[in-house]
Amino acid sequence: MPSKNCAKNLHACQWERDIALVFLGLMVLFNIGQVVYMNRARLYRLIRRGAEQIPADDEEPIIGIRD
């Protein structure tokens, strides 16, 4: 909450706003991290499934790329 002096001097309460924004940003990052950590098994499964679909030896290489 801004202090009562903010109405008189707006520059005096800028640090309060900055601290609140940093705190809010850290809370958002923490919550995103919790969601990722909670669903990490599902994410790892999706990554593994996507990696299995990559062929080891491509029958039709991209035109212009030669070994």
UniProtKB/Swiss-Prot annotation:
<dbReference type="GO" id="GO:0005770">
    <property type="term" value="C:late endosome"/>
</dbReference>
<dbReference type="InterPro" id="IPR033759">
    <property type="entry name" value="Sid-5"/>
</dbReference>
<feature type="transmembrane region" description="Helical">
    <location>
        <begin position="19"/>
        <end position="39"/>
    </location>
</feature>
<dbReference type="GO" id="GO:0035194">
    <property type="term" value="P:regulatory ncRNA-mediated post-transcriptional gene silencing"/>
</dbReference>
<feature type="topological domain" description="Cytoplasmic">
    <location>
        <begin position="40"/>
        <end position="67"/>
    </location>
</feature>
<dbReference type="GO" id="GO:0031902">
    <property type="term" value="C:late endosome membrane"/>
</dbReference>
<keyword id="KW-1133">Transmembrane helix</keyword>
<comment type="function">
    <text>Plays a role in RNA-mediated gene silencing by mediating transport of both ingested and endogenous dsRNA between cells. Not required for the uptake of dsRNA from the intestinal lumen.</text>
</comment>
<keyword id="KW-0967">Endosome</keyword>
<dbReference type="Pfam" id="PF17204">
    <property type="entry name" value="Sid-5"/>
</dbReference>
<keyword id="KW-0943">RNA-mediated gene silencing</keyword>
<keyword id="KW-0472">Membrane</keyword>
<keyword id="KW-0813">Transport</keyword>
<dbReference type="GO" id="GO:0050658">
    <property type="term" value="P:RNA transport"/>
</dbReference>
<feature type="topological domain" description="Extracellular">
    <location>
        <begin position="1"/>
        <end position="18"/>
    </location>
</feature>
<keyword id="KW-0812">Transmembrane</keyword>
<protein>
    <recommendedName>
        <fullName>Systemic RNA interference defective protein 5</fullName>
    </recommendedName>
</protein>
